[in-house]
Amino acid sequence: MTRLAIALGDPAGIGAEVVLKALAHRPSLNPLLVGCRQWLQASYEQLLPCCHEPLADPSQLEILDEPLTEAITPGSISAAAGAASFGWLTRATEAVLDGRAQALVTAPIAKTAWHQAGHHYPGQTERLAELCGCDDAAMLFTARSPQSGWRFNTLLATTHIPLSSVPAALTPERLERRLGQLEDFCRRFRQRPRLRVAGLNPHAGEAGQLGTEEQRWITACLQAYQQRHNNLQLEGPVPPDTCWLGAAQAWNDSQHVEEGCDGYLALYHDQGLIPVKVLAFDQAVNTTLGLPFLRTSPDHGTGFDRAGQGSARGASMLAAIDTAVELG
């Protein structure tokens, strides 16, 4: 079985809670948790009286101990918490790279806390890419429907940048690289995958009336890619407002799984994350492609407003753990 390293995320958030809730459902796993042993044990003892779900006992888990340097207040953003989560991610990544684990699961971090600690990265994905010496890591969100069993895969061509910066960041070279990553991932599940690419502009440009990128180069880029890769079905650019309609049908009804594509390529962050979160909020898993190992993360944030209360749901973290075991 794939051994996981699990970085515990921002200690002021819900990372410890969702990890312990998820691991309570997978007692046969032998993960390596990376964080502060004393803090994790204290969090467990604080959660026990108010939590209505089972929790894994940290004393029964292997922990790579990286102690906190100062006290952390649940729900409060701080440089100390940012420094801790940054260090825990680094140590967990090193554990995978040196063979102590085969895949990485990361609990959520707060970018503001990282910045306060002097670590100016857009997110964990970019730090992981740096640690691994990779310059082209990509964010893919995957989920399996509990209603139909269909697997929903959406990859982002661009990630944490302002919307105004997307047209310049979106180049033919980037689009082709992202298509290649999506194709490779989807071949795990189907030999001849069907991929769909959303347009950049409303109605995919409306023949140049609402934007020109589709006419100027996106359509030609997709056609050229299809010609070079004939063992797939490539659709696009598809008007964004209808691109994921088939995904909704496939997600909700096992009789319509063929309406969904094997993979979707969104051209910017919210274009892809809106359908993912509408359909699969508790099931979606953030998966990083382009690293020398598989990394997954739950598709939610630090949950500062719920920290220490026992009310956080562990379903998305459990999905992240299961996905890492399955695909890692």
Swiss-Prot record:
InterPro entries: PdxA, PdxA_fam. Keywords: Cytoplasm, Metal-binding, NAD, NADP, Oxidoreductase, Pyridoxine biosynthesis. A divalent metal cation binds at residues 160, 203, 269. GO terms for molecular function: 4-hydroxythreonine-4-phosphate dehydrogenase activity; metal ion binding; NAD binding. Homodimer. The active site is located at the dimer interface. This is 4-hydroxythreonine-4-phosphate dehydrogenase. It comes from Synechococcus sp. (strain RCC307).
